[in-house]
Amino acid sequence: MFARSAATILAFVLVTLTAATPAYYAPGTKTTSVDKAVPAGQCNVGNQQCCNTVQEASSNPVAGLLGLLGVNVQDVTGLVGLTCNPITGIGGLNSNCDASPVCCENNSFGSLISIGCIPISL
């Protein structure tokens, strides 16, 4: 009799704790899927960037950076690249990018952030 009561109480406690525990989402782990990459030849050479991170403008770290720069998140189209470097080479050919090669519209924030990016294939 006691074993049955203890098992019932234990099951109730476990269910209660599981239901009351908030879900954990690790910051910065949001991934973005892209259906089709633009060929590098269709992007202006000066706009080709190799970014360490590419995320949606609404993601937590990117939205915070955009806010500090005075950029409205709702006005951003495309992805946002962080810590980007220009891809050198004629038309992006024979260039090497081990991170995320993207074509960005607005690179006016130096190498910290590039706005309006779309993935490209080199």
From Swiss-Prot:
It comes from the Eukaryota. Its main location: secreted. The keyword Disulfide bond applies. One of its GO terms (molecular function) is structural constituent of cell wall. GO terms for cellular component: extracellular region; fungal-type cell wall. Disulfide bonds join 43-103, 50-97, 51-84, 104-117. Keywords: Cell wall, Disulfide bond, Glycoprotein, Secreted, Signal. Pfam families: Hydrophobin. Residues 1-20 form the signal peptide. Glycans are attached at residue 106. It is found in: Secreted; Secreted, Cell wall. Induction: A CT-rich motif, which is often found immediately upstream of the transcription start point of highly expressed filamentous fungal genes, is present at the expected position. One additional CT-rich region is also found upstream of the TATA box in the promoter region. Aerial growth, conidiation, and dispersal of filamentous fungi in the environment rely upon a capability of their secreting small amphipathic proteins called hydrophobins (HPBs) with low sequence identity. Class I can self-assemble into an outermost layer of rodlet bundles on aerial cell surfaces, conferring cellular hydrophobicity that supports fungal growth, development and dispersal; whereas Class II form highly ordered films at water-air interfaces through intermolecular interactions but contribute nothing to the rodlet structure. Belongs to the fungal hydrophobin family. Self-assembles to form functional amyloid fibrils called rodlets. Self-assembly into fibrillar rodlets occurs spontaneously at hydrophobic:hydrophilic interfaces and the rodlets further associate laterally to form amphipathic monolayers. This is Class I hydrophobin 4. It comes from Flammulina velutipes. The gene is Hyd-4.
